[in-house]
Amino acid sequence: MLLEAPVYKEIFGAVKIYELQKVIKLDTETEDVPVYTITNIPREKIYDTLGKMAVIVPMKNEKLHLVDGVLKAIPHKCPIIIVSNSKREGPNRYRLEVDLVRHFYNLTNSKIIMVHQRDPGLAKAFQKVGYTDILDEKGNIRSGKGEGMLIGILLAKAIGAEYVGFVDADNYIPGAVNEYVKDYAAGFLMSESDYTMVRLHWRHKPKVTKGTLYFKKWGRVSEITNHYLNMLISEQTSFETTIMVTGNAGEHAMTMKLAEIMPFSTNYSIEPYEIVYLLERFGKWENVEEFKDVFDQGIEIFQIETLNPHFHEDKGQEHVREMILLSLATIYHSKMASKNLKRRILNDLIEHGILKEGEEPPKLRIMRPINEIDIEEWMKVVENNSETLLRFGL
């Protein structure tokens, strides 16, 4: 794969954020690249990395033909982890998903783990290991997106994955999913740190407008979130920046070493919260001894622009409003946010009709990192008590 080389980066303490890199060629046999501004990632190394990466597919009541396309596009070497929060009654959509996955496995022999997010056996496992952050007041697992991602990471850790990547289940272009996973691998191969994140920026996000496709460069939520994330960073450095272009990158990946020390927020604030947390905790040289290895190696964040457009299910304006509110709540409640920045966020939310005068963005629920969970004990309880856990080829 040929990509623009990671020439420019901004450094905040132990955190390095690289400027957006474009994919130049997805597959190549070129060995010597004469231009220093181009990076060549050998195909063999990409495929070797794919075998160490679990791809997590969170889903909730998605169209089955979209799910089918996404699963078929994930490179065969990657174990697939499906965490579904779909209906189990009236109708039982989860059963339909299970049937689809069984058929997919019979055709492909792919390595798959599948579980329902609200499985009581999962909740029991979390209670057993003393991790109640993911549970509601009744002892059940909450229904948020972040909770599903956290479950996926634990399952990936249980099978020994070194990397975890996330892809949405509602993508209309299966070939895009195939590229996303290979882009993750390329990002990891460019890194010199065990603590690495790769975040994807879509080249275009098509919309149907007046009966034709319009290839929009930015989504509304992304524009707003990136603007305020860059303002947050600029206030800390006193230098204006536009470095962050992947604030809401649902398609992103991490090394397991980074994933297991990350706290996670719930619902749709999870992707911007990852950036805010890393800047808060590792953006200054404070309490270094707690994470000595992280500070020694540094955290590298790569942002890659895909060749493929991202065309996914339109979930409506209410979904967009919720994403904007929760994304900006992450920045608003950051300990780095100044009074001026908070005021600008409030004014923006009121202007868009998302908040009323006198209201504030909600405070986020944060789940602790998973690094203290006894993964063997957790997995043993899941296997012995789960109603929905399925393993194919693993």
From Swiss-Prot:
Reaction it catalyzes: (2R)-3-phosphoglycerate + GDP-alpha-D-mannose = 2-O-(alpha-D-mannosyl)-3-phosphoglycerate + GDP + H(+)
Gene Ontology CC annotation, any one? cytoplasm
Enzyme Commission no: 2.4.1.217
Task: Spell out the InterPro entries in the cross-references.
Answer: Nucleotide-diphossugar_trans (IPR029044), Osmo_MPG_synth (IPR012812)
**What single Pfam family name could you report for this chain, choosing any that match?**
Osmo_MPGsynth
Q: In what pathway does it function?
A: Carbohydrate biosynthesis; 2-(alpha-D-mannosyl)-D-glycerate biosynthesis; 2-(alpha-D-mannosyl)-D-glycerate from GDP-alpha-D-mannose (MPG route): step 1/2
Q: What class of enzyme is it?
A: transferase
Any single biological process term in GO: mannosylglycerate biosynthetic process
**Keyword Transferase in record:** yes
The record's keywords, sorted A to Z, are: Cytoplasm, Glycosyltransferase, Transferase
Q: What is its main location?
A: cytoplasm
CDD domains for this protein? Glyco_tranf_GTA_type
Q: Does the UniProt entry include the keyword tRNA processing?
A: no
Q: Where in the cell is it found?
A: Cytoplasm
One function term, GO molecular function aspect: mannosyl-3-phosphoglycerate synthase activity
Q: Which family does it belong to?
A: Belongs to the glycosyltransferase 2 family.
Which NCBIfam families is this protein grouped with? osmo_MPGsynth (TIGR02460)
Role summary = Transfers a mannosyl group from GDP-mannose to phosphoglycerate to form mannosyl-3-phosphoglycerate (MPG).
Q: What is this protein called?
A: Mannosyl-3-phosphoglycerate synthase
Q: Which organism is it from?
A: Pyrococcus furiosus (strain ATCC 43587 / DSM 3638 / JCM 8422 / Vc1)
Q: What is the lineage of its organism?
A: Archaea, Methanobacteriati, Methanobacteriota, Thermococci, Thermococcales
